């Protein structure tokens, strides 16, 4: 298959290089289109206020001065001279568990691929303090999952979010299909003083696990399993539709009131 590979850690990150090489070794034609620097936390943002510059590193690698979503969007809307068959994003150098997927550039790159009509997988290595040791395990998991997707495709609105414990392949206990867990609210932001005496802020750490019991992605990884979570983008809160519908009469009446 023709595989488009992207990430949010940047085109030079070790995770994307290991992933691309593993996919090539499995017989796939791989094109890497990734940010020219770390764009972690970029979520689904597109660059609309300035033109986006690109730089060909070699015939199979392109660096983009933009977000992960920019990378996939450009690659699938005319920048390449062929159409890929699948998007694989990663390997991220940290977890994308539970609420993380809302902010994750790794997941968003896969999501953009799905929006533009391709099957998509996001792969993350759940490291401690961003010190990764087993990218090869995550890459092997990605290769196996891509093979299954080719043989048994998923519905067109589905993205696979894969989280891999930082273990040797022989130490992984298995694969688990999971749902997204949840974290507590984020830790406080971190204020500092710059050299001119002005207060600046760093975003604080993600909150600790909250909904992380059996069946969640958190639990699977914590117990030595590779978590596969099928996700889709429909933010409708169906349970609230009837309640909000009950407001409509009053809201409509307000239209007849004084301006």
UniProtKB/Swiss-Prot annotation:
Main localisation: cytoplasm
GO terms for MF: 3'-nucleotidase activity; 5'-nucleotidase activity; exopolyphosphatase activity; metal ion binding; nucleotide binding
Superkingdom, natural source: Bacteria
Protein's UniProt keywords contain Hydrolase: yes
Subcellular location: Cytoplasm
Keywords: Cytoplasm, Hydrolase, Metal-binding, Nucleotide-binding
Gene3D superfamilies noted in UniProt: Survival protein SurE-like phosphatase/nucleotidase
Reaction catalysed by this enzyme: a ribonucleoside 5'-phosphate + H2O = a ribonucleoside + phosphate
Gene Ontology CC annotation, any one: cytoplasm
Sites where the protein binds a divalent metal cation: 8-9, 40, 92
InterPro entries in the cross-refs: SurE, SurE-like_Pase/nucleotidase, SurE-like_sf
Pfam family, one: SurE
Enzyme Commission code: 3.1.3.5
Keyword Calcium applies: no
Cofactor: a divalent metal cation
Cofactor detail note: Binds 1 divalent metal cation per subunit.
Family: Belongs to the SurE nucleotidase family.
General function of this protein: Nucleotidase that shows phosphatase activity on nucleoside 5'-monophosphates.
Name of the featured protein: 5'-nucleotidase SurE
């Amino acid at each position: 298959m023709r595989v488009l590979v992207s990430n949010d850690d940047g085109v030079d990150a070790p995770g994307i290089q290991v992933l691309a090489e593993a996919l090539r070794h499995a017989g796939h034609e791989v094109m890497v289109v990734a940010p020219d620097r770390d764009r972690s936390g970029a979520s689904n943002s597109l660059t609309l206020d300035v033109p986006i510059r690109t730089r060909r590193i070699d015939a199979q690698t392109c660096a983009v001065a933009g977000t992960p979503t920019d990378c996939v969007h450009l690659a699938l809307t005319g920048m390449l001279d062929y159409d890929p068959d699948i998007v694989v994003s990663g390997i991220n150098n940290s977890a994308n568990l539970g609420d993380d997927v809302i902010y994750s550039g790794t997941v968003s790159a896969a999501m953009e691929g799905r929006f533009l009509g391709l099957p998509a997988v996001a792969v993350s290595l759940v490291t401690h303090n961003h010190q990764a040791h087993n990218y090869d395990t995550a890459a092997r998991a990605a290769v196996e999952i891509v093979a299954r997707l080719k043989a048994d495709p998923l519905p067109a609105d589905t993205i696979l979010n894969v989280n891999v414990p930082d273990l040797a392949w022989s130490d992984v206990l298995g694969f688990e299909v999971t749902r997204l867990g949840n974290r507590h609210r984020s830790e406080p932001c971190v204020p500092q003083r710059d050299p001119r005496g002005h207060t600046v802020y760093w975003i604080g750490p993600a909150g600790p696990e909250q909904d992380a019991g059996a069946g969640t992605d958190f639990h699977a990884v914590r117990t030595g399993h590779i978590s596969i979570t099928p996700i889709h983008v429909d933010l409708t809160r169906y349970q609230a539709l009837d309640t909000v519908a009950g407001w409509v009469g009053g809201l409509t009446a307000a239209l007849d009131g004084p301006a």
